[in-house]
């Protein structure tokens, strides 16, 4: 086409009053743009949506920022005050990369970069290295003009382009004959009906927006009048009534020239902010993100949660409805962009209502990635935040496997609250109203067929997933991951409600085609996405872990305050349910106590040393530049080991079951760098813990094996402390920690023996005093019985651990836990009675007052001294530290449960993990081979000039299709989740049955043998023999032989005699020919 606009818009007369009175620039002011009312804008939205989108040329990002220069040149041509400013051309969607943007423009009439001052200033913020040292008032100190004649180095460092007019940017009016682009009319952003004072971040009453608002009451309602500041709004004496009813955000171009400026074709342009820029004054208010979006105030309900008794469609209806929607997809012929399938798909209008045509909120971007994550950039894949040229301060990754929508909503809700908190920090040098632009939330699902369907539909309701666009092959190349990008403004609550978020959230959803485990998910995060976004801080979360409202900020602050911090973690708390009802389960209560004491004793101690042995992957943070090099290289070495591509070392395989421990060690001992690890007490996150025995044992097997072998690795490589960049005193301090960890490792190795001996000595001490027996004179028999029961249960656990899955031996493991709890109770009773005997021996049980000589006698008693000191060093210290940390409640609610389940942690879990060091799995099965159920992007043997190879894809093409699919997702999620008991398939049941038969047979065999040994070696049997069977021999002084021994001897002789007789008989028969 010969030009890029059409005169007039549909239904708009060329000589309308507003067109005649609203030029691009006015002679009465130096503020930039004039504006039409909101209603004028709506007249052209239909034309914008109906037109075929056109791409603008993608400029090249210069190596230095020229945005502080503006032209004072007066040679620019004037702009015609005609309705030509309005075009029916659609808002161009975001070009996916540099090549594609160039290809979509006619080479003969290529569009130059936009001359919009809006675009010029979008990247005039301080550089990445110093942006935290500058106040969060964007572009406040820029010169007022950009010199179009300035020369720049055009070497491409990163593709940046000028997406079409976004909020408040207006439409471009291009004249290719002049090789320049004129500034278009800046359209209004607010409507009278929606311009309410919704302050998404709280406390906004103290702020005032920098807009001018004129509706017969200048300055009223907390807004500045036009006289208050140099606004972009000009004061027009001939302005028609109501023309300024809709304000627009103030832009920092305070001294714009009265004549119109153009930018020459060769000059670089900068992308405008996709959500508008606000100029913060001393009393300015945060950007009202959601009130301008058309969705309503933060927290506004878009779809209600399912109600009890609500009628629901059955699964057959939902399946048929989905198939009907999938059949409505249209086959489109589109060009590949740099050989990659990249699509911009409209999202449902229910979640994209807006007063602007911003493609960031109206379209979801999909990429079918066929490359390995290590080659993501090399294969020219891109991400939207990078295309927009945004600096990413924080990248938050949420890894998931098959978690449901409730767990996902819990985690995502916590993340959204944290980002909203960052936006509320208006006095921060880094954060503020636009903080959401510096945070990218990356969700990585481990396997398309393993992912929970309800979680995927929850992402679909947020606009971050559309199953209708996914392809499993692109030109016969299998797809490795499906990448969806969308800046969402809605969230799903745990109750199933769809609500407006406090601020927009940049989401990247990576759905891996195959299940390749968590390490591979982190490789996508670090080596693909972070390598492109270059975040300062990386936050790691597991779906199901819910950070509290300010936790992520607290983690980030530890990096911002201390430049040597390379990693940090917060406190992971057990989710005890509403009213702490989950604590009625002893398993949950014991884990709650274990987590609390670890966060009170272990983590603070290790943080003082500067080396935390493990930063839990469920909630931790790292400085990205600290991870580069050997730490990430060693971290991802475990992926090859678990996939069978690396060495066959069982030691390394178990070591990488706790790969986060390896990462921490490599980070602290990194050569020529002195990074430290910190524990941040104020950062908390809640997580679910196993509440059933099989899941609990399976989880701890991986943890214990990984931590044991990783501890060996850290102790064995202690010398690497001295090759790191740590200061000398820190090296000595870390060496002391290595010695401390070595002692803990030794105690862990002998844990079972130490526990048995402690139990044996306590019972022996309580029954050693003649005439004083805590068991009514049967102390010796009780000690012997329980000693044998202890040994028997160790044998039972050993046999079960050698071959049985916990899921197939639930009864055996549960019985062992109960019996060991009784043994622990008996040991505590014996310890208490021993202390009583010591008090009685010191005369303290019969006196009215304790004297010094009584206390001296008491502490000279070894039984009291040793037991009391050891118990006080443990239990009393727990209580004291809990009180000092102002967190004593777990001592009341969970201490007793943990006390009785201590043998489970020391014996059962340790034995099961040791017996399964050959199992290097994470409890999931890796799927192999590419899938072919989605359909692919097939070649059509045709090319279009400048557009590369064309492919045919079947996709939804309109917002109506997206809305229908969104409604289907909503209907499906409105059906309550049916609690389905876990069932084993036939093969697994047969395998478990065979293993149970083997285990039962071995146990019967071992137990009967042990029973014989126990009976005929017991003290009772020996007394019975001496007093009844051989009483006469005892009186005569003859030696007493155990009758069982005699029976064994005579039986052996008899059996030998039988064999002797048989052998002689055979010879005789052979002699006589038989």
From Swiss-Prot:
Glycosylation sites: 72, 97, 149, 289
Induction: Expression is slightly lower in the yeast form than in the mycelium and shows a maximal expression in the log phase at about 14-18 h of incubation. Shows a late increase in transcription at the stationary phase in both yeast and mycelial cells.
GO biological process, one term: cell wall organization
Taxonomic lineage: Eukaryota, Fungi, Dikarya, Basidiomycota, Ustilaginomycotina
GO terms under cellular component: cell periphery; cell septum; cytoplasmic vesicle membrane; plasma membrane
Keyword Transmembrane: yes
Alphabetical keyword list: Cell membrane, Cell wall biogenesis/degradation, Cytoplasmic vesicle, Glycoprotein, Glycosyltransferase, Membrane, Transferase, Transmembrane, Transmembrane helix
UniProt main location, coarse: membrane
Polar residues bias: start-end ranges: 19-29, 85-119
EC number(s) reported in the record: 2.4.1.16
Region (Disordered), start-end ranges: 1-32, 56-179, 209-255
Membrane topology field: Multi-pass membrane protein
Source organism (scientific name): Mycosarcoma maydis
Keyword Glycoprotein: yes
Subcellular location: Cell membrane; Cytoplasmic vesicle membrane
Gene this protein is translated from: CHS2
Entries under Pfam families matching the protein: Chitin_synth_1 (PF01644), Chitin_synth_1N (PF08407), Glyco_trans_2_3 (PF13632)
The protein's name: Chitin synthase 2
Composition bias, Low complexity: 68-80, 129-143
